[in-house]
Amino acid sequence: MGNVNAREEANSNNASAVEDEDAEICSREAMSAASDGNHVAPPELMGQSPPHSPRATQSPLMFAPQVPVLPLQRPDEIHIPNPSWMQSPSSLYEEASNEQGIPTMITWCHGGKEIAVEGSWDNWKTRSRLQRSGKDFTIMKVLPSGVYEYRFIVDGQWRHAPELPLARDDAGNTFNILDLQDYVPEDIQSISGFEPPQSPENSYSNLLLGAEDYSKEPPVVPPHLQMTLLNLPAANPDIPSPLPRPQHVILNHLYMQKGKSGPSVVALGSTHRFLAKYVTVVLYKSLQR
């Protein structure tokens, strides 16, 4: 047993010595080739590597493989898309503010699945679809002041809202009427009573109301109904002057002229509106039978 171990140790020592000699020979040949300027290895060393040579060991993978990407662009070549839905709210508000008109809500509350509206505001060219809001359908339109005709299209059929102002044409078709006017107080004196009193607080009292406070009777008719077209004072009786625009509260009422008719004739008048025009019909009736 002792001889066998001695032989194995001797063989291993001889093998290591041979390997060291081979490594030294390779290093010497490489140094001589580098000094001579010849970088080509000998033919016997091209196909094999000596043991423990740096070419025999492979370096581990130190970095993960990179995914190819597009090269960066210069600032002047970068294109940024600008779709309509990415616009800022301020720009949308500026576009809406540039549109002049009166905001108007049009509502349909008589059922249906698909509701649209068309009108004379664009000469009946387009149909606008209403959006469902609970049980009703609504749409917001910004229109200039004026009188418009419009109608609803409910599930493909022409309809009109009976609770809204309406008119009929010569063919018997019914349309709704939309009257948009810039609000101006018609009777400036009527709003003076709502102004706060210009008096100091020390002048207020808590006295009880007297009998004279309850003796004043209310007017028989509203004051704006007394100035009808029949009772307007004429600037020049010989030259007929153009009539002013009638107030909307006197439309579709029957009025009697005061004191200008003869004792046997009475004048009755009524004013109607069609679009932006006003028509007043005066009927002179004899009191004699």
From Swiss-Prot:
Post-translational modification: Sumoylated.
Alphabetical GO biological process terms: fatty acid biosynthetic process; nitrate assimilation
Cellular compartment(s): Cell membrane
Region (Association with SNF1 complex (ASC)): 217-289
Protein purpose: Regulatory subunit of the probable trimeric SNF1-related protein kinase (SnRK) complex, which may play a role in a signal transduction cascade regulating gene expression and carbohydrate metabolism in higher plants. The SnRK complex may also be involved in the regulation of fatty acid synthesis by phosphorylation of acetyl-CoA carboxylase and in assimilation of nitrogen by phosphorylating nitrate reductase.
Oligomeric form and interacting partners: Subunit of a probable heterotrimeric complex consisting of an alpha catalytic (KIN10 or KIN11) subunit, and a beta (KINB) and a gamma (KING or SNF4) non-catalytic regulatory subunits. Interacts with SNF4. Interacts with FLZ1, FLZ2, FLZ8, FLZ9, FLZ10, FLZ12, FLZ13 and FLZ14.
Name of the protein this chain belongs to: SNF1-related protein kinase regulatory subunit beta-2
Species of provenance: Arabidopsis thaliana
